[in-house]
Amino acid sequence: MNKIITGMLLILSLPTAAQDFQGRIYDAYLRGRMDLWKETMEQMERKAAIEKDPVLLYELTEVQYGYIGYCLSMKQKKEAERVLEEAEAQAKVLLEKGIEVPRVYSLIGAFYGYRINLQPIRAPHFGKKSEEANSEALKRGPREPQAWMEKGNIEFYKPAIFGGSKTDAVPHYEKAVRLFEESPGRTDRNWVYLNCLAGLGIAYEETDQPEKAGKVYKKLLDLEPDFKWVRDELYPDYLRKQSRD
């Protein structure tokens, strides 16, 4: 009997799998440990394949979104394309099930953006598709912060010759941050929120608003003093630029 009670208490004391996965992803993001991110992502893939849980499938797709972006930044295009194909297929399933529809359309818009990186010759086609998916996200969720963040990304990274504008990206990032902070639970150990704040800081720097950029970086370090990307790269680089100026 004691063994049964002990086992039941152990089960009750454990976090849910989704909570555990998200906590590990968040910690990997803070520490800049993409090896741990990938390891957790692969565990999520195996669990999602067995359980067919649509909530877990959405969380996995979001984690893959972050991993693909990292792979592209590291010029690991084959790995990026492999995971992107999986994520795109999962996004279709999520739409069919009606799970987190505005967020899913936001991710689809980002996936088309990744396609531009992989197939630059088709940039006009994928760029249009990205904007269409983002418009659908905003139509279905006008207060969805991730939709506004991705709208900011589209404007920020689209070449000026095709109508992109870093200046126009700033208010979209600002609105995304505001909506994250107005939405209950959306800032609690959420790597996407931190990423959005970092994107806003970078956009401020790129549009000659250094004072605002500095405030964003300080805010990030107040929230998470051990956020490696900001602590070791973004903020020190910002301070060096300011000392030269």
Predicted feature locations:
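N-terminal leader/linker segments that initiate helical-solenoid repeat arrays
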Residues: A17-M74
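Single-residue signature of alpha-solenoid repeat helices
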Residues: W37-T40, A80, A87, S130, ...
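Flexible helix-coil transition and linker loops at the boundaries of alpha-helical arrays
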Residues: E45-E59, Q90-V104, S135-E144, V177-N190
